[in-house]
Structure formats: structure tokens, C-alpha cells
């Protein structure tokens, strides 16, 4: 059964999830297996999959009910959301530090000043990862901790923190996956030239990448350039109103917003080049995207073709994903933008289209599409008010979105052999601690189970899905929502910093052990 929670301010502030939102947000809390089975079936997840006996698995190939033997199980965090220690050991402010300290920008005036205090507690957090059983951990490196001014001198104390973190991971048999930028650009560059409004940031980012890879590349060989370009561009800059994402800059035209997207893509491409030039060992280079995912409301040939069309033509994908993977903007998208389209200089697209070794795909929800007799040839369907949501106004329960997102990289963009990692997948739940001290986040288990079932479908059909990083290892600072939303499989008491594994932690632990959906 679904239990509604009280009305929350319908702040569609989490970027990149352009979905219809209802006035009353709802959460799903299921305490009986019958209810879970019913919703799983409704979501298109075979219930029998959860009890099927696993067969012996070969690398890259799933056995019945299981994942390939080399499937990468992991969890993820981001520097600003967990580290704290914003003024320690030479770190200078990032744009989110400045943004958080402006009245009215975050729930309850919350900041990332302390967050999960991971900076001081990383060793025990790594032990928690080992207890969970993950063999892969995705984290981000804070640019202003390494190069505090955004350019120039390297802060070796900042490097030392990540060096010690990497060593701790390796000592526990956990492979580090480092994201070089997860929204925390140095405030110094915002003050100097407006950060992403200037082309200069691409060169500064590449220089920063070089310094990090030179120092950590002997132990880190999995690099991700930038996380979710849409979020800090489209949501960080706006015309006529303060945007909900740092740097929170008001600009005079929509073209200026699109230009920040182009500069971020350029930074990604130059970052790829810098990583490959600096690494002392062969390395895998990825971009992490949160592209808009579309899926057919009914799986007919006409609707599937409509999904392909929407996937490449809708603005978010046409201005971020398509150029990153093909080296050119989608023509229909640019035509729709008209004078608002980004200005491109000679050689830009060759840099932007650097070949990737891996694509990181952050997937939370999706939109249903059907074929239509209109100029576009498709329509994106609104969701009814009673459609289930996961304690966020944008986070609708659409488990098939994971499968269709993976499939469209192959079918719509022709990247059939590009390995894909699910670099984020998870949900917020309204967790409560029982009198026995348990956190029975059964709705999160439902969510994860249903999405992982669709990961199995993608693998079974031959799509190159290679791993899964659960978001998140622990509750953390959820950007403009502050600490009012909990995405972790580990509860964090922000007063004491105590970590308490939730029921979803135990469930995911068993999934990893048995290498199948349970």
C-alpha cells in the first residue's frame, strides 16, 4: 500500500529530471511481501526473477536470475555532499559554499560545512564499504581542495587526503573510481571570470585534471571527468530569476545559459585529453551524464521509434549527450534553439567528441512516450497525480527507464560497444528509526529491486551494461534540499555522525554476495 506524506513545497530543484510533478508528493512504504510483489509486477519486474536459482555465470554474461561474474558492484558519494572540512588544510570556498550561506537558498539554511565529516572519518567509512561488500567506490575530488584558486599552485595537503583515501580503498580490495568535477567549482574562478560563462574554465579544468592524475594515477585508473553537465549549467544560470543551483547566477539571455553548457562540454573534452596525457598507467576515461530517459508507454514498433526520436531531439540530450558521444550537436535541437544556440569555435567539436572508454549513466526516473501525429512525431505523456513517487517531487517510480536508457545509447546513437556503468541509482525515503533501532526502508528496497531487474533485462538482451553504483552509500547533503532528504543505505545522525546501516544496506549486501536480484 502507498502511504501519502504531508504536502512538501513542490521545489523541482533537482536538475535534469524534467517530469510532471503533482501538487502532493507521495512515498511508497510497503511492509508486506504481497504489496511488494504487486507493485513489482506493475512495474514490469518479473517476480519469479527474485527466486530463480542462479546458474554458473561467465564474464559479461548473466546466468538465470544472476549477473555476470565480472559485474562491478559499487556505491557512490560526492565530495561536497559528504566531506565537510570546508576550511581545513588549505581548501578554499567553492560556489556551493557561497550559495549555501545565502539566506533562502537551502532548506533550513543547511550547508556543507560539516556534512558527513567524511574528511575525518574516511577510514571507518571505507570499513563500512568493505562490510557492505562492494568492490568499487565512486567518489569525487574537490577542485578547490587541490587547486584552491582554481588555477596555479597545487595544495599538496588536499592531494594527501585523496591519496590516503585511495590507499585505504585499495587495502580493502575496493577499486577507486574518481570523478574530477561534481559541481564544486572554485569560487575564485567565479569571481575571476564567471566560471562556466567563460571559455577559460576549460583550460583551467584541464590543468587541474593533469595535476590530479600525475599524483594519483599510479593507483587510480578509472577517471570520470564531469558529473551531470545539465545540473550546474541549465540549473545554475537563469534569465530573470535566481536559479536553484550554484553558482545561482542571473544572466541576460538564454543563449548565455546554453553557452555555459558548451564550455562544460569543452572542459570535458580537454579533461579527457589531459587525463590520457598525464596518466602513468593505462586508464579508463568516462563522462557521467543524467540524460533524459524516454520509454514507450506500450512496446510497439511505432512507440519505440518515437522514443528514439525524442531521445536525440529533446533539448537536454541534444545539447549534452549527443555532442559528447558524436562530436556534433543534434541538428533539430540546434534549429529549435535558433539564436539561443551556443557559439562554437573552430576545433571545439573535435575536442568535445573525444572517444570515451566508458559512459557513466545516472538514472533515477523517466518519461513515457508514444507516437503522435504532430510535427515532432511523438508526445511525452504527463503522469497522473496518484503516480507513485519516492519522497521527491521529481522522483517518479519508473524502473523500466534504466533498461531503455541503456538500450537507447546503442539503438538511437549507435554506440553498441560502449561500456556503460550505472554511476548513480537510488531514491529518497522518509526513513524512521523503530524502537529497536532499525531503519526499515522497505520502499527503497522495492525501488532498487525493480531497477536492478531492468538492469538484468538489458544485460540479457546483450547491451554492454558493466556495473552498478548505488546512490548513496550514506545519507548526505542533498544540495538545495539540505539534510531534509535521505538517499543513503546507511543512516547518518548529523548530530553525532553515527552511521547505522539500514535494511536496504543488508539487502544490497546480500545482492552483492549472491550476484543476483533478491
Residue ranges and their predicted role:
Residues 16, 33, 37, 55-69:
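Mature N-terminal, pre-catalytic/accessory segment of carbohydrate-active enzymes
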Residues 33, 133, 173:
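Conserved functional loop/turn residues at catalytic and ligand-binding sites
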Residues 22-31, 39-59:
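N-terminal twin-arginine translocation
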Residues 93-128:
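Aromatic- and Gly/Pro-rich amphipathic surface segment
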Amino acid at each position: 500500500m502507498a502511504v501519502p506524506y504531508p504536502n512538501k513545497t513542490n521545489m523541482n530543484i533537482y536538475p535534469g529530471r524534467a517530469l510532471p510533478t503533482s501538487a502532493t508528493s507521495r512515498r511508497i512504504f510497503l511492509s508486506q511481501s504481497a504489496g511488494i510483489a504487486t507493485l513489482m509486477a506493475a512495474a514490469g519486474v518479473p517476480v519469479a526473477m527474485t527466486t530463480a536459482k542462479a546458474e554458473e555465470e561467465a564474464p559479461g554474461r548473466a546466468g538465470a536470475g544472476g549477473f555476470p561474474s565480472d559485474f562491478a558492484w559499487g556505491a557512490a558519494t560526492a565530495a561536497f555532499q559528504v566531506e565537510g572540512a570546508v576550511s581545513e588544510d588549505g581548501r578554499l570556498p567553492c560556489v556551493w559554499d557561497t550559495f549555501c550561506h545565502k539566506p533562502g537558498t537551502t532548506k533550513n539554511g543547511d550547508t556543507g560545512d560539516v556534512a558527513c565529516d567524511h574528511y575525518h572519518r574516511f577510514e571507518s567509512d571505507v570499513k563500512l564499504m568493505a562490510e557492505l561488500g562492494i568492490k568499487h567506490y565512486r567518489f569525487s575530488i574537490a577542485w578547490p581542495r587541490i587547486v584552491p584558486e582554481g588555477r596555479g599552485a597545487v595544495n599538496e595537503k588536499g592531494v594527501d587526503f585523496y591519496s590516503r583515501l585511495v590507499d585505504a580503498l585499495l587495502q580493502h580490495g575496493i577499486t577507486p573510481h574518481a570523478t574530477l568535477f561534481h559541481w564544486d567549482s572554485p569560487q575564485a574562478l567565479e569571481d575571476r571570470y564567471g566560471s562556466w560563462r567563460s571559455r577559460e574554465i576549460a583550460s583551467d579544468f584541464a590543468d587541474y585534471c593533469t595535476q590530479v592524475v600525475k599524483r594519483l594515477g599510479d593507483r587510480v585508473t578509472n577517471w570520470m571527468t564531469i558529473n551531470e553537465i545539465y545540473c550546474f549549467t541549465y540549473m545554475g544560470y537563469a534569465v530573470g530569476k535566481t536559479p536553484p543551483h550554484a553558482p545561482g547566477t542571473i544572466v541576460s539571455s538564454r543563449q548565455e545559459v546554453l553557452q555555459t553548457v558548451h564550455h562544460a562540454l569543452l572542459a570535458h573534452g580537454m579533461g579527457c585529453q589531459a587525463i590520457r596525457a598525464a596518466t602513468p598507467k593505462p586508464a579508463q576515461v568516462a563522462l557521467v551524464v543524467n540524460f533524459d530517459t524516454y520509454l514507450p508507454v506500450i512496446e510497439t514498433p511505432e512507440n519505440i521509434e518515437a522514443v528514439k526520436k525524442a531521445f536525440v531531439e529533446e533539448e537536454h540530450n541534444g545539447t549534452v549527450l549527443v555532442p559528447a558521444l558524436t562530436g556534433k550537436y543534434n541538428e533539430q535541437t540546434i534549429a529549435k534553439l535558433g539564436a539561443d544556440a551556443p557559439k562554437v569555435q573552430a576545433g571545439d567539436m573535435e575536442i568535445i567528441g573525444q572517444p570515451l572508454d566508458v559512459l557513466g549513466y545516472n538514472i533515477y526516473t523517466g518519461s513515457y512516450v508514444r507516437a503522435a501525429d504532430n510535427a515532432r512525431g511523438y508526445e511525452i505523456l504527463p503522469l497522473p497525480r496518484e503516480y507513485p513517487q519516492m519522497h521527491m517531487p521529481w522522483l517518479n517510480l519508473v524502473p523500466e527507464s534504466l533498461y531503455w536508457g541503456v538500450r537507447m545509447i546503442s539503438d538511437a546513437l549507435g554506440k553498441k560497444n560502449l561500456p556503460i556503468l550505472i554511476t548513480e541509482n537510488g531514491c529518497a525515503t522518509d526513513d524512521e528509526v523503530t524502537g529497536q533501532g532499525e531503519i526499515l526502508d522497505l520502499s527503497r528496497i522495492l525501488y532498487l529491486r525493480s531497477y536492478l531487474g531492468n538492469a538484468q533485462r538489458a544485460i540479457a538482451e546483450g547491451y554492454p551494461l558493466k556495473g552498478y553504483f548505488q546512490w548513496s552509500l550514506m545519507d548526505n547533503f542533498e544540495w538545495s534540499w539540505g539534510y531534509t532528504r535521505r538517499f543513503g543505505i546507511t543512516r547518518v545522525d548529523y548530530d553525532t555522525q553515527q552511521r547505522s546501516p539500514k535494511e536496504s544496506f543488508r539487502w544490497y549486501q546480500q545482492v552483492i554476495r549472491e550476484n543476483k536480484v533478491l
